[in-house]
Every structure is written in structure tokens, then in C-alpha cells.
């Protein structure tokens, strides 16, 4: 992990490096440092930002482009205020030469990539560029953190392996960057070095010790990258290294493909087909080798690296401890899995980079055409050879061997005969005369066997600069059948060739043979013949093409240039005039970056500009996308003649601004063009004081910033230049001159009377800036001008303050020699002596104390003395000097920090010894009670600990320490207690081993408990396995309690696997699972649940784990227990206050929990000790949303509960296996369900509309009574709550079935099923079984359509249908009473409950006499 403290330490180190006087840093070094200081606006990615802008100047060219790019840096420097701190530290002092070097490298790279690719390499190039961008994007992001991962890996086994990955990746990046900027010849030499980088990178896939493959597979095979728990920090870091290394491995493959593709293409363009074949072959071999190692061969026993990495990622993703994506890791895993799957798919989809087969040359050559020599390249005595190459849509073979030479004798353009390719591939044919450059002469399509070598000669004739010869040869070849539509290099046709050569005779003849659309055919880069003619200055060809109606404004593919753009940049006036004769021409047409042809004409020169300026409709102030006008470009090009030509048009705006509000004058000043600057200043309309945006920098500011003293001096002397103009932040040219050390400019400023006390917005004067700068000699120059050395900034700092706090020793001494005030304090109450102590300027401190020793122990507002500041910043010489001078060695600031604490924290044993010898107070502590010993423990400095314990006459760790009394409130604790606790808490295992293993302090602090609390598994293992401590410990809270409470799953797993008791009491009457639940650690709960937890055990609050989960609002845990542990919990259980989980959920207004509980069937009618249902509580508390939900959903819970639990699986337990779920009448007598059934016609006229099902339900209750198909068995005196709940639920569900079957669909809504269930449950639970039929009957009566007088008729029918009903154990008296009871049952739905009670009281089988009837129940 990367900690804030480490980041700050790096930043401080960077400041020190920047502040060192006289040390020059490279661009990359300075960029890195400024980035660490978070000052990256000026340097981080500055080169790439500039390159991004370069695309806006495609017409300027390489050399001028470099200059223009330098100008574009202004937009990045001026993108915000010029920060004084950054500027003086060097983060704004642009190293212009270094930037140009970076640009030159990038230009060289771009030039190489712009070279044309052979058709065979185009697809490969696309694949490489597409894939490498995806890999490199994330790899570069990972690269930034990999150093931190490296530093933090301490595992002795893993560290060397990861180090190999790091070393290889660094070497790869360095070499790749080093060669990218080489010029073409140097680049090729570097790539072709024997045993060079290409060979080394190819071997990265071998198992050699210094390869990349070896450490990656070692990590995978040893399982180092699979975390064992969410706390397995080491495995996380190794996983990071594995992913970074694998992406580097993939990048190496694509880098090699890119380089071999480049080399193959280079030699193809040169015509060296042997070299082309060599690298083309290497290209394929590299791909196949790496493909095999990355994705395997497709067999199960030969998986590739990507497959193995994906397995690691999936193992991690599917691990139990990761949970449901709630640890912030899931997103990263998915991202990496998707990336590697995408790369794998991309690689697997490409079987090969080239065809495996090298074509044989079966060509038989015969000269059948009557074409005599000499013509074209055909000359008697020359030797001609042919070679072929197979081509499919995306794959190409190598070029085969050259045929035997054939001598040319009198005839040209032979016929080549070869067999038809059986696989139907195209065949490319190459030709070479003697040792000249080979040429592609044509392509044989499938099914053809004859090829006449004549089309290339026609193309060459059209390309011949000798028009007469070319026309003659073209005429002959055309007559003999050459194809005028054949295409060759880069998709160019004969029309392109003619346009380039300017042979108007050929073109004139062609115009009669082809359509005008063919004259518009673009090549692969979008150049049409008129583009080529314009770019070549062939005005006659342009004129012919215009007459044939070609598109005059067509654009190239990349830069979107029109023919007019190309003619303009070449300066072809006649061509320009021919183009302008077209009525369709758009003179202000813009290219990709917004440049018009007039912009391009700046490069074309004075004559073409004059031609433009005379045109009607020309926009002389047209702006590019970046806001540059042609006048801007003329000044950037430093071509005053061109600028003067533009100025002849009075409409030219010389003060036009670009997107950064910069005028041409700004650019002249930036680039140091003195003569151009003079010309501009002398223009009457010039505004010399325009400022850029948002930096508000004028031309004078920029001239000084870029150190062009001659330009700056000229501008200072100019009357129309404001020399005191303030940029953003109040920075004037004078301030900049000091910051940049421009002595000549400063001298001139003094001479012209510039105010030397100018202040920035923060009240920095030039003297303040000189004191902080790397130009200390300027201080004396300013003092000689009577500069105020006591001036203060907004923070109260004098120049001497700034010199000392910025570490500028020479500047501080100069100021002291001029008797400045060394006792002035700033807003922090600090004097210059504090600054000298902070930055370690010993000579300055000595100079101040030699003048005034009273400052030795003076405190600032934080109570820091010079000694304390020197100690905190590890300036050892200064510390010793201050102590020797009598400084208080035990000085403490407001936070209690003291010198001894500072050096102990940083692990400086020598200084700790020194302070011991100087009798420092070894028990001194800061405001947090931390003494030197604790700091040594927490930071892992075992050497200091051992030294301190050896100095028993000075330090005794058994002493009571009251500074940390609040951490040990019940007893007096010694230093040893806190030290051992700290060692365990801060994961310092070597110190733990020393304290416990070496010194034998097993009982101090309860180390095993502490290790479990903080999740330090390796310390837990050490204590259990090596020191044999009991896994259950000796305290009330066991180690398992601590680990569970803090969610350390790996520790919990280890302790349980080693015998820890999962149901052991913790503090407060809780167990480990209670502790885990209170902190919502689902994974720990799941593990404990699977390892013997007693879910019925109640804690001191009378709550089981389930009630605890609800009380703690641990929704995921509650849901898990209900869903996965329903066999072990009772959803309706109550605590000591008779509150169910639903009561608790309502108390906490947890609607999500309420919905969960209702969904799974909790009883909403249960009352607590205060006789309140959940609805009562919600209503009283005015929880309107909960009340609304409970009222709406309380009747639906049983159906959902049943669907969730199946057919009441809980009824299958041994406890309730005696329950008999009897069949209902509904199932035994389907004739009563369907009103259309024949049997149901018995009721026609009388009961056609009655609710038969409702009555059947009531009869079912009665029949169960007499047949003993009871809802609850009475074998035991009292049914368990679970059985009673099941019976009540079953009865209520059957009643719900009745309601669902009624024709009146609103019937269900009219009955409160929750109320029905509650009453039934209460009746069964209390033994008042007689009330059940009354409850059901009463509920049904309000919605029944049954006429009372028809009830007995219906009962009699039901009676008959039950004739076969068996009542095996019913007594005779019970059977005898059956008929009368049916009648009474009907009466019970007609009369009051009093009537029913009266009737039943006289019945021999009344429920008052229920006890007489054994084993009969409702």
C-alpha cells in the first residue's frame, strides 16, 4: 500500500533535490520531481502536449515545425498563473533545448510511421496499433505505482521474483524510449545489431533466468498471487506485479511485431526483397512463438500465460472472502478479466501473421507479344527475373525465390504461364532487371494461369518525365493490350502517374477512353490525379482535369487537403491560377486543422501570396482551429518578406489573437526574432501590450521568460511598451527578469527608472525573488539599488526568511553581510534561524548565532526551537551544533515533539545514542504519550529497541507509564505493556519475536488477542505454532472474539481450524458470531455458521444471533440467516421483552428489513411485553411509510413464505413429524369446485350462487375433529411454538385458498388474514381449540353469499359425499353426534356465538368436555 507519509517524504526529498544549488536536472528528472511536488502543470507530459498541438501545423514542415512547436509551449506555460514557487524551483524554467530534443525524437518516429506500408503489412500494422494501445494504456497507469509495490514487498521468497519483473519492465521501457527518437539510419542499425534488443526481447518468452516468462510462471506455480483472505496484503501486491508483468509481456510481443513489420516494410520499399522476406519470416515466427506462450496450443495440458492469469483472477473473484463485490476489488478484477479475454480473443483470432507456404516459382516465360526493344526498362542484354507472393484478404506469404534470369533479346513484355493455385489465392508478381530495385508488376487472380507483363510498363511510360518518349511507349503498349485501369503502389493508377509526370498528350488521349469518375479515383491516401498534378505543379494537367469535370475541392484522407492547399504550399502560381479558373473553387476551404490555402501559401513564398491577395473573397485573417492566422505563421516562420506581402492587404489584422490570446508579436518575442520584433513594433497599428490568456503575459514578459535578452532590451526601450504591465498574480517584467537571472535586462530596467520595489499580489519584491532564486548575485545588485531588505510578503517573510527557508545559503549570507534584521518574525513567529535549522544551513545558523546567541532557544508559534526543527528534518550537524551551543536538549513543541522522538521515529540509532550520551530525557513523550521507545517499536527499529534495553541504567521498560493512562484505565501499565501492544498492532513481527520469543513476555498485553484483533495472521501463526499459546487465550474475550468482531476472516479460519471454540463466551455475554454480526461481517458469519455455531443460544440481552442481526440493522446477515439457516432459527422468536425481529425492525424504522421479514412469513400480530403489535408501534410513532406497508402487505405474507420455504420444510423435522396434514375437502371432492360439474347441479335454483368452497372449508374443520385428522397432535401436553405456528399457518392458508376461489375477487381484501392467523394461533397456543371454527365462520360470514336457509341443504349433500369417510378411532358417541353436529355447524353460521356456545355446551362432545376425548383435536 502507498501511504500518505511515504508520499510526503518523497515530496520533501524532491524539494531538497530541486533546491540544491548548481545541480542541473534532465527534463525527465525535473518532470518527475515537479510531479511529486504536484507542480506538474508545467512539466508533466509537456512534450506530449506539444506534440498534440503539432498536428495543427502540418504545412510548416519538420524544421519550422520544431520552432512552431516551441511557440506552442506557451499555451501550456500560460495555461495558469505563473506560480512563483514553481518558477524559482525550476518547474517553470522551460529547458527549451531539451524540449526541442524531445520533439525531434517524436518527429523522427512520426516520419517512420508515415512511410508507406506494403499491402502485406497493412493488416499487421493495424493489429499491432489496436492491441498495443489497449495494453499500454493500463500498463502505464500501473507503472506509476509499481515502484511503491516493489518497496513494500518484504517477503524474502517473493521479493526477488517481483524484482526480476520490475528490472525487465524498466529495461524494456528504457530501451523502447531510447530508440524511438533515432533517425532512420540509426534506428535501423540499432534494430539490426547482432545480439541486440530484438534478440533480447525475443528471449523474454524463454525460461532463462533473466527472462520475463520465468518470474511470471514462478508466481503462478507457487500460488503467490492468490490472496488467502481480504487482508492478505502480500498476495495483493504480488497479484499486482503478476498483472503488470503479464501486460509487459504482451507489450513486448507487440513491440517486436511492430519493429519486424517496420524492417520488412523498409526493405520492401527499398526493393531488397531478400531482406524483406527475412524480416517477414521473423515477424511470423515471433507471433507464433509468443502466441503459443500466451494462449497455449489449445490442449488442456498446454495452457498459455493469459489462461493461467485468468485462472488466478477467477480464483480470486470466486473466493468466499471477496463477498458480493463489496470490497472495492470486484471492479478491478472484472476490468482485468475483460482486458485479458479481449487480448486472448484478438491473438487467437489470428492464426498466423503470414501464410506458412512459400510460393514456388513455376513460371514459364515466353515472349509472345510483338513488342520490340528498346521500350521502357526493356533493353537488349539486360537480365530479367520474376518472383511471386501469395495473397489473401489479410494474409500474405513470403516472396518466393527469384526465377532464373532471362536475357532480353529484341522482345519485351513476356507472358508468364503458371499453374492455377488450388487454394484460390491471388498471386502478386514482382520483376527485377539486373540488380535494380524490384517492382510490383501485377496480380494474377484465381483461376487464371497466364500473366502478360505489360501493365507496369504502361504505368512506367505514363510516369516518364520525357513526354515524347513516354507518349510513344504508352501508345505502343496501349495498342498491344496494356490495361489502363491497373493499380500499383499505394493504389495509384496511370492517371496518377500522368498527373505526376505532366504528360498532357497521354492524359488528353485517355480522357476519350474513360469516364470522368475514373479521373477522380483516389489512391490509398485520398490523393486524386488532380491532387498529384497540383502537388507537382503541372498546370496543364490541372486544366485538362478541370475541363473533364473532376472534383476541384476533393480532400485527402488524413489532412483533408484540397488541390489548392497543395499548390499553395509548393508555391505553384500557374497551377494556382488554373485552379482559380474553376467556378467551383473554394479559396477559403479548411483542412483538418482549420488551415486555409492562404495559410499554406505562407510556406509557398511571396509570389504565391501575391496571387492569393488579389483574389476576390479571400479571407486574409482566416483562423485555424488553434486561432492562428496566416500573419501568425509568417512571423513564426520568421519570413518578413512574406509578412510584408500580407501587409499589402490593408485588411490584415496584425493584432489578431489565437486561442490563447497571443498575437504575432508574442511569437516573435518567444522565438527570439529580434529583427522581426523591430519590424512589428514599428508598425503603426501594433498593440505591444496585448496579454495572453489566462496568464496575462505580454510580449515583454515572454521575451524575458525565454531569456531573449536582445528582444527584451529592445522592447524595454520601445515607447509603446508598458514595462510595468502585470501578469496574473501581479508579476511584472522586473519580477521575471529576477526570476530568470537576466542581469543585462535588469541593468537596463534600472537605467530607465523601473521601480525596484514592485510587489506581486502576494507582496513579493524583486529582492524576495532574488533571495529564493538560483542567482544569489542578483541580491547585491538589488541592494546596491537600495532595495528594501526589510520588506515583507503577505506571510510576513523578509528576503532573509525566504533565503533560509528555501535553503539558499549563499543568498542568506549575502543578506547577513549587509546587516539585515535577523530577528524579524513571520506570521508563524519564525525567525531566519528557524529557516536555517529547517533546511540545514549550518553556516547560516552559525553566522546568526555568532551575532546573537539569544536566538538559540527562541520558540516560534508552534513552540519549535531551532534544535527541534533541525531534528525533525534530520539535519544532524545542525543538531549537534545547537546542542554544543547549549540548546535545551529536551525542547518540546506544542505537539510534544522532541529531538529524541524525531530520531527514534526515523531509525537513526547513532543520534539516539548521541542524545542518550548527552543525557536527554529518555522518558519524554509527545502529547499522544509516545516516547522514543514506542516510536522505535511502531516503525520497526529493532536496533534502537535492543540498544535501549541494554542501557538499563538509563532506561527501564518495566517502569509505569502514565502518559498513556487512558489506554490502560483499570490498572497501572508499564512501558513494556504498551510496547508489546504496539509491536503487535503495527505488525512488527521481528520485534514481537524479540519481546516474546527472546525475552519470554508471553503474558504482557495478551499478544495473541491483539494479533487477532488487528488481523495479523503471520503473528497469530507464530504465537500459536512457535510459542504454543492457547487459541482460546486466557481472557474473557477470546482471540476468536476479537478476530470476528474486526472481520479478519483469515484469522478466524485459522483459529477455528486450530481448535478455537466457536460458542465460547465473549465479553457482554456475546459469542464470536454476535461480535461479527454487530460489525456486519457477513463472510465471518458465514464461516462460523458452517462450523458449529449454536443459533439458539441467547446473549445477555436475550437475543439469538438472528435477533442480533436485525437489531444491528445487518440486512445481508439477516437475509442470509433466514434464507440459508432457516432450519436453525425461529423467525418469530422473542427476546426478554417479547419483541420479535419485526418489532426491532420497526423500532429502527428499517423498512428494508421489515419487507424482508414479512416476505419470509413473520407473524405481524405478535404482541410484545407491553401488549403492542408492530402495527401499534408504527402507528403510535407515526411511521407512516411502515404503517402503510404493514396494512397493505400483512395479508400476503403466508403465500410468499410458502413459496420461499416450499411445502413447509420445517415440518419435516423430528419435533413435528407427528403432525398430520390431512387432505382437504377441496381435493377430495372436486365436484364442488367447478359449478359446471354434474354433481353441482344439485344446487341449481337453490345454491347456484352460493360459495360452496367456503362451506366446504368449514366442513373440513369439523370432519378433522371427528376423524382425528387434527391440525395438531395432542400426544404432548403442549405443542411447541414451531408446531403451533405451522398449524395456524396451514389453517389460514386453506382459508386464503377459499377466498381466492370466490367469484367476488374483492373478498380477499375484505378479510384481514393477518388477524385471522393471529387469532387461530392464539387459540391453538392457549388450548382454546373451540374458537377456531368460530373465527373462520365469523370471517367468512361477512362476505358469504350463502343463504342461511340453504345451509342445511348443502350440509346434507356434503354429508352424503362423506359417506365413505373413515373415522377409525372415533368413539361410538362421537359418530352418533356427527349428524347433529353438521346441523349445528350450519347453525353456527346463522346465529350468534352465544347460540353456538349454548348448543355445544349441551352436546356430549362439547369442547368443555374436551379432555374426555383423547387424541382428538382441531
Swiss-Prot record:
Q: Name one GO biological process term.
A: exocytosis
Can you summarize the PTM annotation of this record? Processed by furin-like proteases at both the N- and C-termini.
The UniProt entry's GO CC annotations, sorted and at most eight, read:
extracellular region; host cell presynaptic membrane; membrane; other organism cell membrane
What tissue expression does the UniProt record report for this protein? Expressed in venom gland, cephalothorax, and abdomen tissues from both males and females.
Segments for region (4C4.1 epitope): 1026-1032
Q: Name one GO molecular function term.
A: toxin activity
Q: SMART domains under this entry?
A: ANK (SM00248)
Compartment(s) of residence: Secreted; Target cell membrane
Q: Residue ranges of region Furin-like endopeptidase recognition region? A: 17-20, 1196-1199
What InterPro entries does the annotation carry?
Answer: Ankyrin_rpt (IPR002110), Ankyrin_rpt-contain_sf (IPR036770)
Q: Does the keyword Transmembrane apply?
A: yes
Any signal peptide, and if so, which residues?
1-20
* ANK repeats: from-to residues: 458-489, 490-521, 525-554, 559-589, 593-622, 626-656, 660-690, 695-723, 729-758, 762-791, 795-824, 828-857, 862-891, 895-924, 928-957, 971-1003, 1004-1033, 1035-1064, 1068-1097, 1101-1131, 1137-1166, 1170-1199
Indicate yes or no for the key word Zinc-finger.
no
Question: What job does this protein perform?
Answer: Presynaptic neurotoxin that causes massive release of neurotransmitters from vertebrate (but not invertebrate) nerve terminals and endocrine cells via a complex mechanism involving activation of receptor(s) and toxin insertion into the plasma membrane with subsequent pore formation. Binds to neurexin-1-alpha (NRXN1) in a calcium dependent manner, adhesion G protein-coupled receptor L1 (ADGRL1, also termed latrophilin-1 and calcium-independent receptor of latrotoxin (CIRL)), and receptor-type tyrosine-protein phosphatase S (PTPRS), also termed PTP sigma.
Q: What else is known?
A: Is the main neurotoxin responsible for the human envenomation syndrome known as latrodectism that results from bites by Latrodectus species.
Q: Domain comment text?
A: The H8 helix is predicted to insert into membranes and form pores by assembling into tetramers. The helix is contained within a helical bundle domain that undergoes significant conformational changes during pore formation to allow exposure of the H8 transmembrane helix and transition of the toxin from a soluble monomer to a transmembrane tetramer.
Write down what this protein is called.
Answer: Alpha-latrotoxin-Lhe1a
Q: Which species is the source of this protein?
A: Latrodectus hesperus (Western black widow spider)
Amino acid at each position: 500500500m502507498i501511504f500518505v507519509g511515504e508520499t510526503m517524504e518523497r515530496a520533501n526529498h524532491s524539494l531538497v533535490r530541486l533546491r540544491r544549488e548548481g545541480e542541473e536536472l534532465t527534463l525527465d528528472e525535473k518532470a518527475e520531481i515537479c510531479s511529486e511536488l504536484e507542480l506538474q502543470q508545467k512539466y508533466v507530459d509537456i512534450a506530449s502536449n506539444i506534440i498534440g498541438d503539432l498536428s495543427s501545423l502540418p504545412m510548416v514542415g519538420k524544421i519550422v515545425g520544431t520552432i512552431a512547436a516551441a511557440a506552442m509551449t506557451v499555451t501550456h506555460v500560460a495555461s495558469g498563473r505563473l506560480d512563483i514557487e514553481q518558477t524559482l524551483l525550476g518547474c517553470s524554467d522551460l529547458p527549451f533545448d531539451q524540449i526541442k530534443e524531445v520533439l525531434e525524437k517524436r518527429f523522427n518516429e512520426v516520419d517512420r510511421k508515415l512511410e508507406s506500408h506494403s499491402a502485406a503489412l497493412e493488416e499487421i500494422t493495424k493489429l499491432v496499433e489496436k492491441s498495443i494501445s489497449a495494453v499500454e494504456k493500463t500498463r502505464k497507469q500501473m507503472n506509476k505505482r509499481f515502484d511503491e509495490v516493489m518497496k513494500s514487498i518484504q517477503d524474502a521468497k517473493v521479493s526477488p521474483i517481483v524484482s526480476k519483473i520490475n528490472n525487465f519492465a524498466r529495461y524494456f521501457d528504457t530501451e523502447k524510449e531510447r530508440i524511438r527518437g533515432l533517425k532512420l539510419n540509426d534506428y535501423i542499425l540499432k534494430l539490426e545489431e547482432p545480439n541486440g534488443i530484438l534478440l533480447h526481447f525475443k528471449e523474454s518468452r524463454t525460461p532463462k533466468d533473466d527472462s520475463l516468462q520465468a518470474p511470471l510462471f514462478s508466481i503462478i506455480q507457487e500460488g503467490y498471487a492468490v490472496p488467502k483472505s481480504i487482508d492478505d496484503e502480500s498476495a495483493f501486491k504480488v497479484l499486482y506485479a503478476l498483472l503488470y508483468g503479464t501486460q509487459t509481456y504482451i507489450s513486448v510481443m507487440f513491440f517486436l511485431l511492430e519493429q519486424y513489420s517496420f524492417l520488412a516494410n523498409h526493405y520492401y520499399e527499398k526493393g531488397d526483397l531478400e531482406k524483406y522476406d527475412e524480416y517477414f519470416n521473423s515477424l511470423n515466427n515471433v507471433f507464433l512463438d509468443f502466441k503459443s506462450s500466451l494462449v497455449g496450443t489449445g490442449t488442456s495440458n498446454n495452457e498459455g500465460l493469459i489462461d493461467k492469469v485468468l485462472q488466478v483472477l477467477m480464483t480470486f473473484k470466486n473466493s468466499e472472502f471477496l463477498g458480493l463485490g463489496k470490497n472495492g476489488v470486484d471492479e478491478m478484477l472484472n476490468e482485468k478479466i475483460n482486458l485479458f479475454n479481449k487480448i486472448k480473443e484478438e491473438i487467437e483470432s489470428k492464426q498466423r501473421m503470414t501464410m506458412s507456404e512459400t510460393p514456388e516459382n513455376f513460371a514459364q516465360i515466353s515472349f509472345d507479344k510483338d513488342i520490340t526493344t528498346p521500350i521502357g526498362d526493356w533493353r537488349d542484354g539486360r537480365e530479367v527475373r520474376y518472383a511471386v507472393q501469395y495473397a489473401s484478404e489479410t494474409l500474405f506469404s513470403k516472396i518466393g525465390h527469384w526465377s532464373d534470369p532471362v536475357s532480353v533479346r529484341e522482345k519485351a513484355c513476356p507472358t508468364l504461364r503458371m499453374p492455377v493455385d488450388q487454394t484460390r489465392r491471388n498471386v502478386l508478381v514482382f520483376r527485377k532487371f539486373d540488380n535494380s530495385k524490384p517492382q510490383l508488376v501485377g496480380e494474377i487472380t484465381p483461376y487464371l494461369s497466364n500473366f502478360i507483363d505489360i501493365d507496369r510498363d504502361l504505368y512506367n511510360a505514363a510516369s516518364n518525365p520525357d513526354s515524347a518518349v513516354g507518349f510513344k511507349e504508352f501508345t505502343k503498349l496501349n495498342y498491344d493490350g496494356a490495361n489502363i485501369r491497373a493499380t500499383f503502389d499505394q493504389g495509384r493508377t496511370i492517371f496518377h502517374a500522368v498527373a505526376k509526370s505532366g504528360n498532357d498528350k497521354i492524359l488528353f488521349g485517355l480522357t476519350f477512353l474513360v469516364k470522368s469518375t475514373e479521373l477522380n479515383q483516389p489512391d490509398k491516401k485520398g490523393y486524386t490525379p488532380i491532387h498529384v498534378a497540383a502537388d507537382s505543379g503541372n498546370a496543364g494537367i490541372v486544366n485538362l482535369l478541370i475541363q473533364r469535370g473532376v472534383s476541384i475541392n476533393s480532400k485527402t484522407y488524413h489532412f483533408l487537403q484540397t488541390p489548392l492547399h497543395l499548390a499553395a504550399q509548393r508555391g505553384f502560381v500557374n497551377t494556382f491560377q488554373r485552379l482559380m479558373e474553376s467556378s467551383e473553387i473554394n479559396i477559403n476551404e479548411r483542412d483538418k486543422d482549420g488551415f486555409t490555402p492562404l495559410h499554406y501559401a505562407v510556406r509557398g513564398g511571396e509570389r504565391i501570396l501575391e496571387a492569393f491577395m488579389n483574389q476576390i473573397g479571400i479571407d486574409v485573417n482566416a483562423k485555424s482551429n488553434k486561432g492562428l492566422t496566416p500573419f501568425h505563421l509568417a512571423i513564426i516562420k520568421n519570413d518578413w518578406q512574406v509578412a510584408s506581402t500580407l501587409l499589402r492587404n490593408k485588411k490584415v489584422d496584425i493584432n489578431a489573437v489565437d486561442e490563447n490570446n497571443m498575437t504575432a508579436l508574442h511569437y516573435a518575442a518567444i522565438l527570439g526574432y529580434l529583427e522581426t520584433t523591430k519590424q512589428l513594433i514599428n508598425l503603426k497599428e501594433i498593440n505591444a501590450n496585448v496579454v495572453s490568456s489566462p496568464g496575462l503575459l505580454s510580449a515583454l514578459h515572454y521575451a524575458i521568460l525565454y531569456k531573449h535578452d536582445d528582444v527584451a532590451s529592445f522592447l524595454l526601450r520601445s515607447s509603446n511598451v508598458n514595462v510595468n504591465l502585470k501578469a496574473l498574480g501581479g508579476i511584472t517584467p522586473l519580477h521575471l527578469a529576477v526570476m530568470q537571472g537576466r542581469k543585462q535586462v535588469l541593468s537596463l530596467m534600472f537605467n530607465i527608472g523601473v521601480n525596484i520595489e514592485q510587489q506581486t499580489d502576494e507582496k513579493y519584491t524583486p529582492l524576495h525573488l532574488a533571495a529564493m532564486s538560483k542567482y544569489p548575485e542578483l541580491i547585491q545588485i538589488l541592494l546596491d539599488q537600495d532595495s528594501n531588505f526589510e520588506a515583507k510578503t503577505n506571510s510576513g517573510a523578509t528576503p532573509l526568511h525566504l533565503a533560509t527557508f528555501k535553503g539558499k545559503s549563499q543568498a542568506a549570507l549575502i543578506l547577513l553581510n549587509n546587516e539585515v534584521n535577523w530577528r524579524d518574525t513571520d506570521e508563524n513567529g519564525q525567525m531566519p534561524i528557524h529557516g536555517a535549522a529547517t533546511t540545514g544551513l549550518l553556516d547560516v545558523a552559525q553566522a546568526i548565532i555568532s551575532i546573537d546567541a539569544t536566538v538559540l532557544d527562541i520558540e516560534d508559534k508552534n513552540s519549535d526551537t531551532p534544535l527541534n526543527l533541525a531534528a525533525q528534518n534530520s539535519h544532524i550537524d545542525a543538531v549537534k551544533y545547537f546542542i554544543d551551543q547549549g540548546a535545551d536538549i529536551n525542547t518540546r513543541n506544542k505537539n510534544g515533539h522532541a529531538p529524541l522522538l524525531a530520531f527514534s521515529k526515523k531509525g537513526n540509532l547513532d543520534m539516539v545514542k548521541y542524545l542518550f550520551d548527552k543525557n536527554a530525557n529518555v522518558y519524554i513523550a509527545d502529547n499522544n504519550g509516545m516516547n522514543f521507545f514506542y516510536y522505535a517499536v511502531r516503525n520497526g527499529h529493532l536496533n534502537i529497541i535492543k540498544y535501549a534495553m541494554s542501557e538499563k541504567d538509563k532506561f527501564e521498560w518495566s517502569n509505569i507509564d502514565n502518559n498513556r493512562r487512558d489506554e490502560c484505565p483499570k490498572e497501572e501499565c508499564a512501558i513494556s505493556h504498551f510496547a508489546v501492544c504496539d509491536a503487535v498492532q503495527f505488525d512488527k513481527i521481528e520485534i514481537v519475536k524479540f519481546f516474546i520469543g527472546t525475552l519470554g513476555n508471553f503474558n504482557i498485553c495478551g499478544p495473541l488477542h491483539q494479533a487477532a484483533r488487528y488481523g495479523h495472521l503471520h503473528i497469530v501463526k507464530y504465537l500459536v505454532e512457535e510459542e504454543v499459546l492457547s487459541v482460546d487465550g486466557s481472557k474473557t474475550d477470546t482471540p476468536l472474539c476479537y478476530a470476528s468482531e474486526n472481520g479478519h476472516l483469515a484469522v478466524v479460519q485459522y483459529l477455528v481450524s486450530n481448535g478455537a471454540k466457536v460458542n465460547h463466551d465473549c465479553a457482554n455475554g456475546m459469542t464470536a458470531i454476535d461480535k461479527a454480526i454487530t460489525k456486519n461481517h457477513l463472510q465471518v458469519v458465514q464461516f462460523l455458521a458452517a462450523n458449529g455455531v449454536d443459533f439458539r443460544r441467547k446473549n445477555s440481552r436475550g437475543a439469538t444471533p438472528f435477533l442480533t442481526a436485525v437489531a444491528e440493522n445487518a440486512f445481508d446477515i439477516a437475509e442470509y440467516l433466514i434464507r440459508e439457516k432457516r432450519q436453525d432459527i425461529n423467525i418469530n422468536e422473542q427476546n426478554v421483552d417479547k419483541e420479535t425481529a419485526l418489532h426491532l425492525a420497526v423500532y429502527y424504522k428499517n423498512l428494508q428489513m421489515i419487507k424482508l421479514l414479512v416476505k419470509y412469513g413473520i407473524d405481524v400480530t405478535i404482541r410484545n411485553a407491553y401488549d403492542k403489535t408492530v402495527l401499534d408501534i408504527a402507528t403510535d410513532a407515526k411511521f407512516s411509510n411502515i404503517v402503510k406497508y404493514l396494512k397493505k402487505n400483512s395479508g400476503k405474507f403466508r403465500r410468499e413464505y410458502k413459496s420461499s420455504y416450499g411445502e413447509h420444510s420445517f415440518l419435516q423435522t423430528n419435533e413435528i413429524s407427528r403432525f398430520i396434514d390431512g387432505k382437504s375437502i377441496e381435493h377430495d371432492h372436486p365436484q364442488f369446485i367447478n359449478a359446471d360439474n354434474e354433481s353441482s347441479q344439485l344446487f341449481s335454483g337453490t345454491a347456484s350462487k352460493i360459495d360452496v368452497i367456503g362451506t366446504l372449508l368449514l366442513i373440513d374443520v369439523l370432519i378433522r375433529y371427528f376423524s382425528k385428522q387434527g391440525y395438531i397432535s395432542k400426544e404432548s401436553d403442549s405443542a411447541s411454538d414451531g408446531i403451533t405456528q405451522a398449524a395456524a399457518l396451514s389453517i389460514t392458508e386453506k382459508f386464503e385458498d377459499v377466498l381466492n376461489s370466490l367469484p367476488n375477487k374483492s373478498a380477499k381484501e375484505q378479510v384481514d388474514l393477518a388477524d385471522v392467523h393471529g387469532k387461530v394461533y392464539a387459540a391453538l397456543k392457549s388450548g382454546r381449540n373451540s374458537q377456531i371454527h368460530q373465527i373462520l365462520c365469523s370471517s367468512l360470514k361477512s362476505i358469504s353469499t350463502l343463504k342461511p336457509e340453504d345451509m342445511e341443504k348443502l350440509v346434507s349433500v356434503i354429508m352424503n359425499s362423506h359417506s365413505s369417510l373413515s373415522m377409525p378411532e372415533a368413539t361410538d358417541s362421537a359418530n352418533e353426534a356427527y349428524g347433529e353436529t353438521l346441523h349445528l355447524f350450519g347453525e353456527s353460521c346463522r346465529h350468534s356465538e352465544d347460540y353456538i356456545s349454548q348448543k355445544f355446551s349441551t352436546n356430549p362432545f362439547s369442547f368443555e368436555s374436551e379432555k374426555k376425548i383423547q387424541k382428538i383435536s382441531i
